[in-house]
Regions:
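Nucleotidyltransferase catalytic core that binds NTPs
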Residues: 10, 16-180
């Protein structure tokens, strides 16, 4: 069987998707410039952050709800180093590059950036989004960057948590299935 059509399809698929996603995954410098462009156009920027390790339906629903709150959604993900610091050895399961690419592939997500700090507070202070959101497992007073966003006239919201949809529970289910063998 001739494998050239499959190889050509794979190459075209990869080129198309990397071009589509490369414009969504931004460095901090590019993010600052994009934020100024959005601000000048009068567009509302929504910001959220997290590890997003093992993307699941709870993430997808949460991000769609967050995107509906403004004109553009920025998702800031923890670097691999900061995920290890927060979650412990063996995490993240997916590398920061893989997590960024998967998030960038979602229609609801306009921009993705990676931060290496343990808290996104300095990034939030740089970007000053119009809306800052976290999942319902956070109380408003626990959301990093709340003070900065509110002081600039922005809103801070906690969106409902999707029960049973968590990376930790998925990892637990996988371990249970594999330990039975």
């Amino acid at each position: 069987m001739d494998e050239r059509p499959c190889a050509i399809y794979h190459l075209l698929f990869t080129l198309y998707h990397s071009k589509q996603m490369s414009g969504k995954i931004l460095s901090r410098g590019a993010l600052r410039a994009e934020r100024e462009r959005l601000r000048a156009a009068g567009k509302l920027l929504v910001f959220t952050n997290g590890c997003f390790d093992i993307l699941h339906v709870g993430h997808v629903r949460y991000l769609a709800a967050a995107r509906a709150l403004g004109d553009a959604l920025l998702v800031a993900i923890n670097s691999d180093r900061s995920v290890r610091e927060l979650k412990g050895a063996g995490r993240p399961i997916m590398s920061e590059g893989e997590r960024a690419e998967m998030l960038a592939a979602l229609r609801a997500v306009d921009y993705v950036t990676v931060f290496d700090e343990s808290s996104p507070r300095s990034l939030i202070a740089e970007v000053l989004p119009d809306v800052l959101v976290k999942g319902g497992d956070y109380r408003l007073d626990e959301i990093h960057g709340r003070e900065e966003v509110e002081a600039a006239g922005g809103r801070v919201l906690s969106l409902p948590f999707v029960e049973g949809a968590s990376t930790t529970s998925i990892i637990g289910r996988i371990k249970a299935v594999t330990s039975d063998k």
